[in-house]
Every structure is written in structure tokens, then in C-alpha cells.
């Protein structure tokens, strides 16, 4: 068994233990040993307090936690036959905030975490991608901050915004504010075209097969070339099973298994505490090894 005591690239520390057989991972176990306890923090609190607490689960993806919280609170009203009517404008502002944060996260993920590690496979000199001093690294940080400025216009602050509320949002951006948001996001699009993909935005959106990856000219092309040079496409392959819950209006919910698409049934999502530490559990149980719960779909 091989163990990585601290798994990086995630929010919060984790421990990874792998069992190998014939140079292939035959079993893996991930332990989250830092107690967060948000479920216990929320006990006894007013329901709306969750809008303040849960975005603080993560300093990167707080919008996702906020959106999930507001959906849960609105679901309560729906279950007592008092559904809240959310306007299309409010829905759109929620989606805009969520997707701006996704764009910000992708820029940071690519330039701060992934690309430097891939380059180190080829050379110790990171050059323009060097953290804190490389010109491209600094450009990426500036671009990410511009997207967050756009989000702050409707969110009031970042991170840990709480502008989504049951029934809608607490912002009503003016035309000037919307123009400012567009300017911030236009700068991100220009960086995307010039530095990330090296092609026109519309041309990139026209890509519909892996063969089109050869048209890339930017940093993504550099990443592509290094990945194939070191056969990274052969690593980490799983079981070709993917799930999207459809929490964004941009994507329909569904399950893909062996290239067949199936309708997603949320009643088949199950949460298990069999291997989870419990505060009220005084009996030492060898099965319990993590503070996280296990989630499965259709067994």
C-alpha cells in the first residue's frame, strides 16, 4: 500500500491510500481527517443563517454552496405547497454569478496548479509561468481578479457572497453596472483568445471533435503537446461513467454510461455514513476512517 499523507489541489487536507496490483491501483481510500462540522454549526440556527454559513465551506466555490443552499430553502417552501415564484431576471443573475466564479476557478486552476506541474515534467524552468513573477502567471491572476470584480457588482463582495435569497436576489444592477460587468468579462475573453487558446472565440466555439484541438495555438496548445509527449492521456482512466445533476440552466441533467445517455433520477442518490466518524458514536468502529460521507447513485 502506498499513502499520500496530504493530497494537494483540493480545499482542505485529505489522505490518500492506494493498494496496487500489477502496477495498477486495485483499491483506493480517501480520508478527510479535518473536522469541519457545518451540519452541527447549523443546528438550532435560523434557516436563513445557512446563506451566510455555507458559502464559507470553500473560499473558491462559494457561489456553488450559496446556490445549493438557496435551492434547498426554496425546496422547503415547495414541499409545504407554498412554492416561491422566482423571476427569470433573478434566475439569470444567479446563473451569471455562478458561472463567473466557474470561469475564475478555471483560470486559477490552469495557471496556478495544473500547467506548472505539467511543465516541470519537461523542464525545471517555468519561465513566464513561474508563480508570483512570470508574466503569463501575473496576467492570469489579473484576468481572474477582473472576473471577480464583475461578480462583486451583483454579489456585493467576494468571496462568501450572500446575494441569493429564497425567492430571488437582493441586487438589481443598473445599466451602468451591467456595462461595467461586461467590460470586466470582455477582458477575460480577450485573454482567453490571445493567451489560452490562441484562436478567435467564435472559432473555438465551433470545435466539435478532438481533431479540432490541433487548431489551438495558445497555452492550451502547450499543455496539449506536453500531455501527449508524456502520455498523460493514458493515465487516470476510469469507467466512462459521468453524471451531471443539471444544477445549471446551461446543462441538462443526465447520466452517461458506456456512451448511452440516461435520464437522471434524484431519488436514486443515496448518502451513507457507514465509514464516517460520528460525534455521537462512542464505540470505536474500524470501518470509520473519514469525516466525509459517501454518496452513490443507483448503487
Describe the residue ranges of each PLM region.
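Active-site bordering "gate/hinge" segments
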Residues: 1-299
